């Protein structure tokens, strides 16, 4: 079976990245094309991409003129054709002045912008005759209206991937003011619309797929998700193992492999020196690369870190940005621990790689985690994850039991400062035993987190959709759940 699959998303690595969704959209189509599928990506042409894509020398090539132009929500949408840099994946860029600001998310017009984008994608799929998809693979609330609009298209199926259920997009009353809604539309917001009307729904890890069926993690949509039944499943994300390879990564001070970890000591010293920490190969160096938001467990970190630094000969490095309150608290903590703690605001890809390749442990005390990619990258680089058992962290990190020689990291269950502190202390104590610690590192490095395994599961999902009967019959009221 060869399917024509259109990935619709707000971001795609390497050209536009805020969260893990960009890594999925930028990596999975590459692997699917290697498996013989005709996969293409469509996303907004943001203002910061205008200088990168164009017909001029030195720019990523794109069509000089739009390949498609049409009225959408009373405005003209233009679509240009290009290729995702570094790949052979065709890329469609939706152009409109609303995408001109140099940002991806936020702003007063965020809901309008992505409703406009979703509408343009649906119109494009209906009317662009040179290439017509069999399946539109939608990602998060930004594209949630596409399955609703395509629900009566007999020849186009939809997959809706939930990357983070907490963000649900505009409500129905807001949608009614912006665009037209199908007569059968009965969802309260765009996240619910994507779940309700997609032929298949998946989350980015099996555990998260189970968690969101409960009131604790369902964000008010647990009944709808439970109604979805077998059409909701979890497919674990992967990572680009060619990009994230400690043997060849140019961002590292020294490359290394599972057979020779000596380069990690060089990277550790370089990381300490670069960030003004005391250079000491024997100190327990903790690293973290994350958005500073409640989801990532930053409040737990703030409650725990001062006491743990006082208890142990350890250091801590954090790279990230987010809520102003958390940024301020982290900055204050770094000032209290000169030479032992460093905070770098923003996102610096090369520094992130050096943290993976030089830190001894990687902290992920998440309140919830749909999948998480950082722990996979950390393990590939021999950086041992310390994670709370939630969502995709359950599926990727197993607790280290030294006496049995099993496990790839350290885990704790309750979202409590005491549990996090205890987990840190156990990892610190294990770090003192170099032989068992190195064996722990190597088990993590040997774990297969490539996209190949995940891509095969997505292929099976696409096959299910290709074999479905025509969809218009499913719009009758007896096949709809209660309004969601």
UniProtKB/Swiss-Prot annotation:
<dbReference type="GO" id="GO:0009011">
    <property type="term" value="F:alpha-1,4-glucan glucosyltransferase (ADP-glucose donor) activity"/>
</dbReference>
<keyword id="KW-0808">Transferase</keyword>
<feature type="binding site">
    <location>
        <position position="17"/>
    </location>
    <ligand>
        <name>ADP-alpha-D-glucose</name>
    </ligand>
</feature>
<dbReference type="Pfam" id="PF00534">
    <property type="entry name" value="Glycos_transf_1"/>
</dbReference>
<dbReference type="GO" id="GO:0004373">
    <property type="term" value="F:alpha-1,4-glucan glucosyltransferase (UDP-glucose donor) activity"/>
</dbReference>
<keyword id="KW-0320">Glycogen biosynthesis</keyword>
<dbReference type="InterPro" id="IPR001296">
    <property type="entry name" value="Glyco_trans_1"/>
</dbReference>
<dbReference type="InterPro" id="IPR013534">
    <property type="entry name" value="Starch_synth_cat_dom"/>
</dbReference>
<dbReference type="InterPro" id="IPR011835">
    <property type="entry name" value="GS/SS"/>
</dbReference>
<dbReference type="GO" id="GO:0005978">
    <property type="term" value="P:glycogen biosynthetic process"/>
</dbReference>
<comment type="similarity">
    <text>Belongs to the glycosyltransferase 1 family. Bacterial/plant glycogen synthase subfamily.</text>
</comment>
<comment type="pathway">
    <text>Glycan biosynthesis; glycogen biosynthesis.</text>
</comment>
<protein>
    <recommendedName>
        <fullName>Glycogen synthase 2</fullName>
        <ecNumber>2.4.1.21</ecNumber>
    </recommendedName>
</protein>
<comment type="function">
    <text>Synthesizes alpha-1,4-glucan chains using ADP-glucose.</text>
</comment>
<keyword id="KW-0328">Glycosyltransferase</keyword>
<dbReference type="Pfam" id="PF08323">
    <property type="entry name" value="Glyco_transf_5"/>
</dbReference>
């Amino acid at each position: 079976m060869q399917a024509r699959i259109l990935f619709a998303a707000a971001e795609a690595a390497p050209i536009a990245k805020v969260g893990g969704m960009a890594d999925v959209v930028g990596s999975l189509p590459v692997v699917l094309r290697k498996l013989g599928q005709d996969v293409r990506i469509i996303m907004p042409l943001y203002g910061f991409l205008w200088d990168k894509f164009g017909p001029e020398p030195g720019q990523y090539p794109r069509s000089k003129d739009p390949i498609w132009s049409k009225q959408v929500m009373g405005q003209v949408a233009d679509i240009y054709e290009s290729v995702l840099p570094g790949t052979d994946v065709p890329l469609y860029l939706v152009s409109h002045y609303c995408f001109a600001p140099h940002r991806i998310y936020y702003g007063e017009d965020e809901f309008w912008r992505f409703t406009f984008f979703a509408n343009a994608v649906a119109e494009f799929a209906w009317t662009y005759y040179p290439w017509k998809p069999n399946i539109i693979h939608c990602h998060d609330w930004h594209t949630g209206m596409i399955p609703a609009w395509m629900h009566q298209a007999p020849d186009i199926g939809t997959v809706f991937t939930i990357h983070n259920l907490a963000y649900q997009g505009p409500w129905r009353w807001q949608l009614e003011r912006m665009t037209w809604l199908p007569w059968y539309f009965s969802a309260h917001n765009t996240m619910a619309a994507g779940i309700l009307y997609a032929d298949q729904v998946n989350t980015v890890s099996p555990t998260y797929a189970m968690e969101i069926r409960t009131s604790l993690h369902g964000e008010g949509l647990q009944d709808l998700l439970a109604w979805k039944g077998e059409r909701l499943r979890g497919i674990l994300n992967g990572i680009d193992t060619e990009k994230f390879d400690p043997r060849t990564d140019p961002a590292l001070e020294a490359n290394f492999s599972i057979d020779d970890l000596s380069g990690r000591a060089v990277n550790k010293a370089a990381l300490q020196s670069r960030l003004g920490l005391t250079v000491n190969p024997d100190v327990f160096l903790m690293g973290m690369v994350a958005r500073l938001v409640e989801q990532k467990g930053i409040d737990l970190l703030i409650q725990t870190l001062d006491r743990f630094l006082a208890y142990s000969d350890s250091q801590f490095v954090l790279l990230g940005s987010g809520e102003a309150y958390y940024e301020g608290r982290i900055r204050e903590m770094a000032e209290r621990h000169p030479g032992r703690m460093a905070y770098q605001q923003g996102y610096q890809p090369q520094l992130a790689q050096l943290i993976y390749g030089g830190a001894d442990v990687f902290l992920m005390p998440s309140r919830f985690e749909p999948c998480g990619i950082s722990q996979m990258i950390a393990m590939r680089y021999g950086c041992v994850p310390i994670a709370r058992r939630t969502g995709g962290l359950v599926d990727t990190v197993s607790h280290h039991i030294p006496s049995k020689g099993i496990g790839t990291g350290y885990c704790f269950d309750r979202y409590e400062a005491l549990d996090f502190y205890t987990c840190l202390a156990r990892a610190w104590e294990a770090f003192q035993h170099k032989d068992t610690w190195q064996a722990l590192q190597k088990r993590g490095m040997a774990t297969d987190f490539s996209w190949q395994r995940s891509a095969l599961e997505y292929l099976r999902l696409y096959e299910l959709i290709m074999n479905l009967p025509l969809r218009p019959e499913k719009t009758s009221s007896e096949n709809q759940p209660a309004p969601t």
